[in-house]
């Protein structure tokens, strides 16, 4: 596709590029941000959209590895020019099946209002969530979900669930009041946006171990979430982690090899479909090691500069 191969600029996921020129409708001139490397050509948002559509149609499970980078920085010019892709369009582009670019801005370190822990069932995200809470209860809080199922005699409202009638939960759902909502064995379960807002307004960080599909609803200027993907390791590592979890009392159910293989397949599918929304990826092959790395990384967000979607600041 390139008019000249040597003119192209190599890039990969999460690279930050500075756009120097958008004069050509198909090829933009760009360079790696804060780098002395030479400038080169990259596909425009329009061409990239077409290119990704073609790649996704190929029988290649690794096709998603090509073409998307974390963000674009539009070079400021004194002369007004027509901008083909701007931050206000990011929502329209970013959440389509075809993944393209997103304009970003660099800001000072701050406490993210929401931390989203994303991962396949059985990868250990709830265990890591609980470990984060235990390590710093003054900083983190869990968004307790709601349910319409009957309350057991030994349960307290607000302990593991808030209990509401099915009619009231359905009404809240119709008003888009849930970030997640579903039905299990005839009972509704869901996490309310008002719960997240209450935690954020209290000054704490809300920890969400939500499904990947919920990212699109929470990824707004109001919540400014930091999205962490916990990737599944090998089946043998998953089994070892599961045995550790059982020994620590985190889980009681019995799992078979096919359960671990299912976790690995689901993890790959989540990464393929939502990788463009992740801020950080950890391979969760050891709970203690992953927790230590995750905790230190989240601590660094308080002081180190961060790239965020530019539309959050406009």
Regions found by a protein language model. Give the residues of each.
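Glycine-rich phosphate-binding loop of ATP-dependent small-molecule kinases
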Residues: 1-206, 212-314
């Amino acid at each position: 596709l390139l008019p000249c191969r040597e003119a192209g600029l190599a890039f990969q996921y999460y690279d930050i590029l500075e756009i120097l020129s958008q004069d050509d409708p198909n090829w933009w001139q760009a360079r790696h941000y804060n780098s002395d490397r030479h400038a080169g050509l990259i596909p425009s948002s329009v061409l990239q959209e077409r290119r990704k559509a073609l790649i996704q149609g190929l029988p290649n499970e690794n096709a998603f590895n090509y073409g998307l980078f974390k963000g674009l920085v539009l070079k400021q010019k004194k002369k007004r020019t027509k901008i083909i892709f701007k931050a206000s369009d990011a929502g329209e582009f970013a959440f389509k099946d075809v993944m393209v670019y997103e304009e970003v801005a660099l800001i000072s370190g701050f406490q993210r209002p929401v931390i989203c822990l994303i991962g396949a069932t059985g990868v250990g995200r709830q265990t890591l969530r609980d470990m984060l809470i235990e390590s710093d209860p003054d900083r983190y809080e869990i968004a307790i979900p709601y349910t319409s199922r009957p309350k057991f005699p030994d349960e307290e409202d607000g302990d593991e669930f808030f209990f509401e009638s099915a009619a009231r939960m359905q009404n809240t759902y119709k008003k888009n009041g849930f970030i997640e909502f579903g039905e299990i064995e005839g009972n509704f379960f869901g996490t309310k946006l008002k719960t997240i807002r209450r935690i954020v307004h209290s000054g704490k960080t809300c920890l969400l171990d939500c499904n990947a599909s919920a990212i699109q609803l929470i990824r707004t200027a109001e919540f400014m979430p930091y999205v962490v993907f916990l990737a599944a390791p090998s089946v043998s590592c998953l089994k070892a982690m599961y045995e550790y979890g059982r020994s620590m009392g985190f889980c009681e159910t019995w799992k078979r090899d096919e359960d671990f293989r299912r976790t690995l397949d689901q993890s790959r599918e989540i990464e393929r479909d939502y990788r463009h929304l992740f801020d950080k990826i950890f391979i969760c092959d050891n709970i203690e090691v992953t927790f230590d790395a995750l905790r230190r990384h989240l601590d660094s967000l308080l002081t180190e500069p961060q790239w965020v979607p530019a539309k959050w600041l406009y």
